[in-house]
Amino acid sequence: MQITISEAAQAHFRRLLDQQEEGTNIRIFVVNPGSPNAECGVSYCPKNAVETTDHEIKYSEFSAFIDEVSFPFLEDAEIDYITEEMGSQLTLKAPNAKMRKVADDAPLIERVEYAIQTQINPQLAGHGGHITLIEITKDGKAILQFGGGCNGCSMVDVTLKDGIEKQLLAMFADELTGVKDVTEHQRGEHSYY
């Protein structure tokens, strides 16, 4: 497994590490891995903080250490250092932090759930919403329930048909036939539109 650290981010880490005790590297970790409130982080990793169970990924001028629990949740992670007019910031994208990547041959319900958690729900989160996969019917329909800002939103039908259904049918073309909303929508202050 490799974690992609851009050249700019590697240079940033090198500058920071130059100010630390010799032999200090970085640690990449996930707090609450596999949960909706998973958060990724980077910290200094002095020599004496390296555990025998840690995974080491070597870069040109330093190593990144990852603890055994965080390791599978950091698959496909990317770290970048972006400089803009307003300043600079380190970005860490870890698409599998909230849910471990599933195998291509995993049951359909697991693969659809993974797609929802890693691709669809992050898009809905901007409106305070999310969807939950209830089941997949024998005829291939994904039964979904909307929550948060999506519950009671007047745009939910458009989101369902033009967004979620199109995306899921494209990803699971030969396996899914459609999606169905089983939410009892109640319009309220929580609703986005």
UniProtKB/Swiss-Prot annotation:
Keywords: 4Fe-4S, Iron, Iron-sulfur, Metal-binding. Binds 1 [4Fe-4S] cluster per subunit. The cluster is presumably bound at the interface of two monomers. GO terms for biological process: iron-sulfur cluster assembly; protein maturation. One of its GO terms (molecular function) is iron ion binding. Its cofactor is [4Fe-4S] cluster. [4Fe-4S] cluster binds at residues 150, 153. It comes from the Bacteria. Involved in iron-sulfur cluster biogenesis. Binds a 4Fe-4S cluster, can transfer this cluster to apoproteins, and thereby intervenes in the maturation of Fe/S proteins. Could also act as a scaffold/chaperone for damaged Fe/S proteins. Belongs to the NfuA family. Homodimer. This is Fe/S biogenesis protein NfuA. It comes from Histophilus somni (strain 2336) (Haemophilus somnus). The lineage of its organism: Bacteria, Pseudomonadati, Pseudomonadota, Gammaproteobacteria, Pasteurellales.
